């Protein structure tokens, strides 16, 4: 397979495997679980634990404590520039603020904003998606779930008109004037896309200018920055920020344009619990206020329930099952859906 055809999670696993192949006895891993599905994350952590038993030293920087703590020999917390050794792990987890609870879905019209009929897509000589049938309803929060490489990001790109299907048809019902095929400037005024890599869409010299670029007013840009907890970063250059901060800025900048359809690809990577809480509250506040439609791709169990009215499970390029929030529990449990 060509590396350009790999999913974000597969690329993450490839990079980590390349680092392990160097056989260096000291390994420094910065958020190695980013974009990994639950089985990939568990396999990686078990592999790293095996290496430590062979004399390797492994240092991991990670926000997803529930996946890391069972494998860690020591835990250190960086707070206000100082390292503190954590001996009470239960207290550490208890101190983490819980992610936002799912808000009750408002009564919504069963009105489609987009339909996909028999959609397929090929890249690098491989079939990535095949026979995808899906309806996205106006005002809903739809979650796309599945293992790494199953086609979630590819499906999101087709919905965003960043690529065209090689089979089947995608129809939009946002506005007839937008047509059915091209991703025009007018299209992207109504449809917001947040990529896996925030570096791909941060281009202004300051955070304030980034958020204000597509906002209807300076006051609204300021409101968005307050919602996403990034006011204190206003004068910073976006590319000088941490990955988690970049992620919040990129989402805030797209949200400031008030899109009717918001497509999010792994929006919570790099977020600590407080950042996660702020991000989810901001997204759901805007969703309730504007009635926008949100489609999210995620492997992060912490956020899934708060961004889901309905979920679709993908396997090997096909939608295997759709359901409500109960599908989230199946996806992270031992259900046969996996």
Predicted regions span which residues?
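Conserved ABC ATPase signature
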Residues: 2-6, 237-241, 245
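Helix-to-loop junction immediately C-terminal to a conserved catalytic motif
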Residues: 160
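Catalytic Walker B motif of ABC-type/P-loop ATPase nucleotide-binding domains
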Residues: 27-30, 262-265
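H-loop/switch region of ABC-family ATPase nucleotide-binding domains
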Residues: 62-63, 298-299
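Conserved ABC ATPase "signature" region
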Residues: 219-233
């Amino acid at each position: 397979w060509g590396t350009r055809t790999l999913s974000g999670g597969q690329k993450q696993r490839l990079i980590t495997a390349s680092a392990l192949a160097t056989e260096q006895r000291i390994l420094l891993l910065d958020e190695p679980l980013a974009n990994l599905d639950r089985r990939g994350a568990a396999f990686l952590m078990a592999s790293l634990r095996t290496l430590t038993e062979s004399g390797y030293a492994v240092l991991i920087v990670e926000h997803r404590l529930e996946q890391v703590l069972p494998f860690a020999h020591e835990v250190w917390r960086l707070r206000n520039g100082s390292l503190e050794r954590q001996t009470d792990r239960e207290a550490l987890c208890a101190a983490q603020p819980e992610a936002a609870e799912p808000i009750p879905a408002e009564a919504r019209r069963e009105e489609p904003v987009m339909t996909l009929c028999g959609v397929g897509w090929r890249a690098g000589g491989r079939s990535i998606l095949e026979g995808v049938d899906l309806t996205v309803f106006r005002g809903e929060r739809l979650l796309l779930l599945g293992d790494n490489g199953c086609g979630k990001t590819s499906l999101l790109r087709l919905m965003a008109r960043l690529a065209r299907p090689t089979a089947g048809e995608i129809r939009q019902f946002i506005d007839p004037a937008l047509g059915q095929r091209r991703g025009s400037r007018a299209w992207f005024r109504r449809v917001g896309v947040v990529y896996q890599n925030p570096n791909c869409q941060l281009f202004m010299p300051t955070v304030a200018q980034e958020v204000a670029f597509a906002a209807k007013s300076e006051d609204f840009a300021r409101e968005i920055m307050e919602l996403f907890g990034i006011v204190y970063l206003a004068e910073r250059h976006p590319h000088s920020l941490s990955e988690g901060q970049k992620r919040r800025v990129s989402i805030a900048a797209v949200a400031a344009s008030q899109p009717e359809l918001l497509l999010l690809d792994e929006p919570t990577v790099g977020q600590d619990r407080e950042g996660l809480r702020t991000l989810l509250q901001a997204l759901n506040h805007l969703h309730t206020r504007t009635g926008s439609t949100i489609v999210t791709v995620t492997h992060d169990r912490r956020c899934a329930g708060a961004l889901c009215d309905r979920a679709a499970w993908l396997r090997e390029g096909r939608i295997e099952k759709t359901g409500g929030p109960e599908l989230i529990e199946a996806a992270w449990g031992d259900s046969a859906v996996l």
